[in-house]
Amino acid sequence: MYWYTIGQTLTPQEHAPAPEQPAVVLLTSEELSHQPELPGLERTLHHTPPARDARVCKAEVRSDCLSGTLVLPRQGKDGKPLACGYLVTSTRVVLVDDESALQGLLRRIAREKRWTNGSVSRFLYDFFEQLIARDLHQLEKIEDRIEALEDQVLAHELDDFSAPMTALRKETMAWFRYYSQLDDVACELRENENGFFTDSEQLLFHMFEDRVIRLREESQLLRESCAQLQSLFQAEIDTRQNHIMQILTIVTTIFLPLTLLVGWYGMNFVGMPELTWKYGYPVVVIVSIVTVGISLWVCKKKKFW
């Protein structure tokens, strides 16, 4: 369990500060399950959801607090999406994290942020801003992967397409869903049903909401790019199949007269003079070669290939 006071900066503390002092407490789901006695949270701590139960980003408003969960598309050390639970009161912020991912984020806030009037709302704004601070770079990396896959398709290298394409579709969908849910959280903070924040502090959450919307639009563009890339791949597959069918059609067209010739002379009627003529076999061979040659010439003239 880690305590931080909110003043002109975020300051680590060894002990819990006074209830009237704005503060942040970081703990694990296991520590939360023991319902510890935390100053200023006696009546509200039980509303805090554990990180292990987090599945989506959400915010639930109550008369004396706001609580919810956050699930990020980025993965932790165990390969699972990063998740945390949170609770907000007028003077306290509770963060529940089982992956130690938020500890580095809080240290970054303590190192980089300076506030004239430190408050819970100001910390929350910077906390959520830090959550999405590097997301644009992550989306750009996804865009680069899409472009690389597109170049691969245009180069007719289609063998290793399906697996990375499926991964990209799932990843872009996860980011889009994340921003849609995070927008709902930002909306709950901006509406300030509990009256925890001043009008100027509500503007901060409005700014955060605008940024989330822009990131959601960016992720939607990536989803559309994936759909277009899938269409391009399908068009390339169709072109390849059409080329194969064209070759088969040409071969069939060229040798169809020979099939007729073989079927004709394969009947072996007694009255067929070519069967007993000593030049019958060579003549049939020559006729077959001439027929194939004429068929090839016609196909070439018609630009069938």
Task: Give the label of every model feature segment.
Residues 154, 161, 180, 187, ...:
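Alpha-helical coiled-coil oligomerization motifs
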Residues 26, 213-305:
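Hydrophobic alpha-helical transmembrane segments and their immediately adjacent juxtamembrane loops
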Residues 113-116, 188-206, 223-238:
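Hydrophobic alpha-helical transmembrane segments
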Residues 39-40, 154, 204, 269, ...:
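Aromatic-residue hotspot detector
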Residues 1-191, 211-214, 304-305:
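Peripheral, non-transmembrane regulatory/ligand-interaction domains of membrane transport proteins
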Residues 125, 159-166, 173, 199-206, ...:
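Alpha-helical membrane and juxtamembrane elements of multi-pass inner-membrane transport
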Residues 104-106, 111-113, 145, 171, ...:
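Generic alpha-helical propensity signal that fires on short helical segments
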